[in-house]
Amino acid sequence: MSRRRIMWKSISQVLADQFGAYYNIKEKNKVPGGEVNETWLITDGIQPVFVKVNERSYRSMFRAEADQLNLLGKTNTIRLPQVYGVGCSQNHSFLLLEALPITQQTNATPHFAEELAKLHQVSGTKNYGLDFDTWLGPEYQPNKWNGSWAKFFAEQRIGWQLQLCKDKGLDFGDID
């Protein structure tokens, strides 16, 4: 059996576990535009699913994205896709999401802007960070808790990016 076929079988199994019934993929359409991941829209004829695929080593990136979506969803401020699952096959990892309808910019745009503003007004803690690390594209991003926004941003956003640049041979000098 080909690696791709094994991957699609693994995806069907995760979706079957999520939906409580066998998920027979009847249609697969590649979605253009992903720079880091391969993206697909699949359906069993009833439930469309958005699929992000990458090498097996990217599973932790997909797990972090799923955790972030679930965390943001708890704010009840903005419409986000439901996470159906994260999984792996022999050579691939994948993130399975509710397929949201894509629409042209309409009069719903101001509503989305209002929801986004509400999201940024949510405050659940006086500290900055997360209980888990995340990813910025293909790059790991630490999120250790810090009581100071300025220190968090300087060390774990700007400082971290400068360190990544230095590791790749780009040195901006001493910033301490």
Give the label of every model feature segment:
Residues 21-30:
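Conserved N-terminal boundary motif of the eukaryotic protein kinase catalytic domain
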Residues 29-151:
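ATP-binding pocket architecture of kinase catalytic cores
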Residues 7-21, 124-176:
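An alpha-helical support segment within catalytic cores of ATP-dependent transferases
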Residues 1-6:
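Short, Lys/Arg-enriched N-terminal segments with co-localized hydrophobic residues
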Residues 10, 23, 64-67:
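Short, conserved clusters of charged catalytic residues that mark active-site
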